Regions:
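Phosphoinositide-binding peripheral membrane targeting modules
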Residues: 127-133, 139-185
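N-terminal alpha-helical membrane-insertion module
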Residues: 1-74
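Pleckstrin homology
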Residues: 209-229
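Cytosolic/matrix-facing juxtamembrane and C-terminal tails of multi-pass cellular membrane proteins
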Residues: 83, 87-89, 93-94, 168-175, ...
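Canonical phosphoinositide-binding patch of PH/PH-like domains
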Residues: 193-214
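Short aromatic-glycine-enriched beta-strand elements
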Residues: 187-192
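Anionic N-terminal interaction surfaces
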Residues: 2-11, 65-136
Length: 229
């Protein structure tokens, strides 16, 4: 992972793109008009070439020092898959896993005031410099959660493993929230939440889909059974 290029991406701005692009378009316009012998100003051809080159440089040169959005997406996807495989390869409690319940990989960008944030120019996805990935296993007695958070702009990561006995939990759920950015725009975010004694003891970024809803249903059913025994 190229931390410097990632840092440049999160600190970059689209303003140079929107300044340079019109200049390049005007330059190309002069160049094309000259080809059809339409002249509006003296030295139209060389001026058009210069404007096109300068505009393109202003618009696109800053991006050459930044990571592309696709590269960041590939990096977090690879990190998620690698961590998931790493955790699965060193399991020591396979016999205790609940049958017919697949482990869940929960992952997503970390949205907080402590991270750098940038909205994609094309896809408008709001990416941040922090990412979280977790592997959640459902055993006969409780949840076992391996989680890792890491930075995309510097060498920093944190790993943790905890077990959560069903009998001690209130419930688990997926919570959909809105995070308000510094520019006052809002982002929909989802968290896998474990609650104990009326308090959220774990919140993990997750994609809200059928798999996580199914896991929550299974876990809450197990919590109910344990509390009634």
């Amino acid at each position: 992972m190229d931390y410097r290029k990632n840092l440049n991406y999160f600190k970059s701005s689209d303003k140079w793109y929107y300044i340079g692009l019109p200049i390049a378009v005007i330059g190309c316009g002069f160049f094309v008009c000259t080809l059809f012998y339409w002249y509006f100003i003296p030295y139209q051809m060389p001026i058009g070439i210069i404007l096109a080159a300068v505009g393109a440089g202003i618009a696109f040169l800053p991006y050459s020092k930044c990571a592309k959005e696709a590269e960041i997406d590939e990096a977090v996807c690879a990190a998620s898959e690698n961590y998931s495989q790493e955790v699965s390869s060193k399991l020591s409690f396979e016999k205790e896993l609940l049958k017919n319940t697949e482990p869940l990989t929960a992952h997503g960008y970390i949205y907080s005031d402590d991270v750098l944030m940038r909205r994609g120019r094309v896809d408008r996805v709001c990416r941040t410099s922090g990412y979280s990935v977790a592997k959640i296993f459902c055993t006969k007695y409780g949840l076992v959660v391996f989680d890792k958070s890491f930075s995309l702009t510097r060498e920093a990561e944190h790993e943790n493993m905890d077990s959560y006995p069903f009998a001690q939990l209130d419930f688990v759920s997926v919570v959909d929230e809105q995070f308000v950015c510094k520019d006052q725009s809002k982002i929909k975010v989802s968290y896998f939440v474990i609650q104990k004694d009326g308090t959220d003891i774990l919140r993990l970024p997750v994609k809200h889909d059928v798999a996580v809803d199914k896991l929550c249903s299974t876990v809450n059913e197990m919590i109910g059974k344990m509390k009634n025994t």
